[in-house]
């Protein structure tokens, strides 16, 4: 599933091709995604794309009359292609641009979304989200306050989008390992010093993943159709039973909140 770095890489890739371009046509080949694509999205036709932003794992394509909201779901990707290239099997949505290019949305599992929001109003999918992890709003003081008294396992806690957005399973595993925190430890029992380190590691891991083009485990490709390379930098995710990169102790694996968690029982307390 594309997580925050992969979505940010997609944003960076499509922005130079889209900003300032007019959407001459929107082609919806299959409206049945995670939620039905609303008829209102047709309003994007004839509009200039003013900017492309990201909120959590949603991409926002802004125009003067509203904004398209794109979520990549489990297997979605966005490509910039010449409009003359015919669509393939799982190409569900095209935005045809005045430049002669097309923004093409491919989603084999159809668990992504295309929605429509009105100017200056948060769509309901955006209204309850926590701060961005790479922003100045996500601080040790903020996380310490949110964690106070919480018995929830820190891994589940940090993956809650109401606490902070975009720290998905891959990056939660990696950040907890880097900070030396056991994933089942109660969020409210972690010291201020460890919380501060954890916040720093989350920011560092996510920033490095973006620099590496995201993580491609199966489906993700960027706007040029290329995979991300952060998978080569993973320290623990997907490596249960292999030696810890710090102490050589075999890495443990368990399910926490129905998600695979890999950690070192020696290095993470």
From Swiss-Prot:
Catalyzes what? Answer: Hydrolysis of DNA containing ring-opened 7-methylguanine residues, releasing 2,6-diamino-4-hydroxy-5-(N-methyl)formamidopyrimidine; 2'-deoxyribonucleotide-(2'-deoxyribose 5'-phosphate)-2'-deoxyribonucleotide-DNA = a 3'-end 2'-deoxyribonucleotide-(2,3-dehydro-2,3-deoxyribose 5'-phosphate)-DNA + a 5'-end 5'-phospho-2'-deoxyribonucleoside-DNA + H(+)
**Active site feature:** 2 (schiff-base intermediate with dna), 3 (proton donor), 57 (proton donor), 259 (proton donor)
- Output the Gene Ontology terms for molecular function: 8-oxo-7,8-dihydroguanine DNA N-glycosylase activity; class I DNA-(apurinic or apyrimidinic site) endonuclease activity; damaged DNA binding; zinc ion binding
What are the EC numbers?
Answer: 3.2.2.23, 4.2.99.18
Q: One matching Pfam family, short form? A: Fapy_DNA_glyco
List residue spans of FPG-type Zn fingers.
Answer: 235-269
What biological-process GO terms show up in the record? base-excision repair
Q: How is the cofactor bound here? A: Binds 1 zinc ion per subunit.
**Cofactor or coenzyme needed:** Zn(2+)
Ordered alphabetically, the record's keywords are: DNA damage, DNA repair, DNA-binding, Glycosidase, Hydrolase, Lyase, Metal-binding, Multifunctional enzyme, Zinc, Zinc-finger
* InterPro entries given in the database record: DNA_glyclase/AP_lyase_DNA-bd (IPR015886), Formamido-pyr_DNA_Glyclase (IPR020629), FPG_cat (IPR012319), MutM-like_N-ter (IPR035937), Ribosomal_uS13-like_H2TH (IPR010979), Znf_DNA_glyclase/AP_lyase (IPR000214), Znf_FPG/IleRS (IPR010663)
Binding of DNA occurs at 90, 109, 150
Q: Which PANTHER family match?
A: FORMAMIDOPYRIMIDINE-DNA GLYCOSYLASE
Q: How does it assemble?
A: Monomer.
Q: What does this protein do?
A: Involved in base excision repair of DNA damaged by oxidation or by mutagenic agents. Acts as a DNA glycosylase that recognizes and removes damaged bases. Has a preference for oxidized purines, such as 7,8-dihydro-8-oxoguanine (8-oxoG). Has AP (apurinic/apyrimidinic) lyase activity and introduces nicks in the DNA strand. Cleaves the DNA backbone by beta-delta elimination to generate a single-strand break at the site of the removed base with both 3'- and 5'-phosphates.
Note the NCBIfam families from the entry.
Answer: fpg, PRK01103.1
Q: Which family does it belong to?
A: Belongs to the FPG family.
Know the name of this protein? Formamidopyrimidine-DNA glycosylase
- Supply the source organism's classification: Bacteria, Pseudomonadati, Pseudomonadota, Gammaproteobacteria, Vibrionales
Q: Its encoding gene is what?
A: mutM
């Amino acid at each position: 599933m594309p997580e925050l770095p992969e979505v940010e890489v997609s944003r960076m890739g499509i922005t130079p091709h889209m900003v300032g371009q007019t959407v001459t046509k929107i082609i919806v080949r299959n409206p049945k995604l995670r939620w039905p694509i609303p008829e209102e999205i047709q309003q994007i036709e004839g509009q200039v794309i003013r900017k492309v932003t990201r909120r959590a794992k949603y991409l926002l394509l802004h125009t003067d009359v509203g904004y398209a909201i794109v979520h990549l779901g489990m297997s979605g990707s966005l490509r910039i292609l010449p409009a003359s290239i015919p669509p393939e099997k799982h190409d569900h949505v095209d935005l045809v641009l005045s430049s002669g290019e097309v923004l093409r949305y491919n989603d084999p599992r159809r668990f992504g979304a295309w929605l429509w929001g009105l100017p200056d109003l948060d769509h309901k999918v955006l209204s309850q989200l926590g701060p961005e992890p790479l922003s100045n709003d996500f601080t040790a003081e903020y996380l310490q306050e949110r964690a106070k008294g919480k018995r929830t396992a820190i891994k589940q806690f940090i993956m809650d989008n109401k606490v902070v957005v975009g720290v998905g399973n891959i990056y939660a595993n990696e950040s907890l390992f880097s900070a030396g925190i056991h994933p089942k430890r109660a969020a409210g029992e972690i010291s201020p010093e460890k919380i501060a380190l954890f916040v720093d590691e989350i920011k560092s891991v996510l920033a490095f993943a973006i620099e590496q083009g995201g993580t491609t485990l199966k489906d993700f490709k960027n706007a040029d159709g290329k995979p991300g390379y952060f998978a080569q930098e993973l320290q623990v995710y997907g490596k249960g039973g292999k030696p810890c990169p710090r102490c050589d102790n075999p890495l443990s694996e368990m399910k926490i909140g129905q998600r695979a968690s890999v950690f070192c029982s020696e290095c993470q307390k």
